[in-house]
């Protein structure tokens, strides 16, 4: 579905990505991990069109999207959430999600956009009493739900999730994990960046590890956790799937 071929990106003298080869297969939940500054968010930004690669290319459904702007990448079926929760603060939650419904993929346009926005807010678990509340009056957890609903409103084929569990309690994290599983069941392929290894290892079909902008490992969660290089530069110790 998605293929990055030799993708490199520099910011001044800093090589954020170094000839990264990377794939995401249809219907999988793929994980992208690595130390801070390893290039994870930069790679998501290249895929979503925020940054253009200095070399290499990004293919989506066998089409080169490397030079497309973010709104055109979105129109192809790739939508990204951000680490920092973003919204239109003076618009209601419903209006925020409507922006996604109205400006999503052309073939996915709805006959009743308001009802679609309501359904998505219900799907992500936002209280109906908050539908007509300005986004600036929501807490962080509620804003994350709205951001996710707005992303889903564009009818993505591939959803990029950048650290969606940041700032959540264990209970809220469990709810978010269940929601990610439900999204995949709806036929959406997912690529997620996350620092909570227990989540990545429990959710993902395949995991890719970046370090200093280079891919150092790729495989099943168990293969990645047992890779000596990954343990050395990132995990610190071998990850146990049976730890509480």
Task: Put a short name on every predicted segment.
Residues 1-244:
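Glycine-rich phosphate-binding loops of nucleotide-dependent enzymes
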């Amino acid at each position: 579905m998605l293929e990055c071929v030799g993708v490199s990106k520099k910011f001044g003298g800093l090589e954020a990505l170094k000839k990264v080869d990377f794939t995401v297969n249809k219907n999988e939940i793929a994980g992208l991990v690595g130390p801070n500054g390893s290039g994870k968010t930069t790679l998501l930004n290249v895929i979503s069109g925020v940054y253009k690669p200095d070399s290499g290319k990004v293919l989506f459904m066998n089409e080169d999207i490397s030079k497309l702007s973010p709104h055109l990448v979105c129109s192809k079926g790739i939508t990204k959430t951000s680490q920092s929760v973003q919204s239109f603060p003076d618009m209601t939650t419903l209006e925020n999600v409507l922006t996604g419904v109205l400006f999503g993929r052309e073939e996915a346009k709805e006959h009743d956009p308001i009802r679609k926005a309501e359904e998505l807010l219900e799907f992500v678990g936002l209280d109906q009493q908050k539908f007509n509340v300005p986004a600036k009056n929501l807490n962080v957890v509620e804003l994350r739900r709205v951001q996710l609903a707005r992303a889903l409103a564009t009818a993505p084929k591939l959803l990029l999730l950048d650290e969606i569990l940041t700032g959540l309690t264990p209970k809220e994290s469990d709810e978010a994990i269940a929601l990610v599983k439900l999204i995949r069941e709806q036929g959406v392929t997912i690529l997620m960046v996350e620092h909570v290894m227990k989540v990545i290892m429990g959710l993902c079909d395949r995991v890719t590890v970046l370090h200093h902008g280079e891919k150092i490992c790729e495989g099943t969660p168990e293969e990645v956790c047992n890779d000596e290089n990954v343990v050395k530069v990132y995990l610190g110790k071998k990850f146990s799937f049976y730890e509480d």
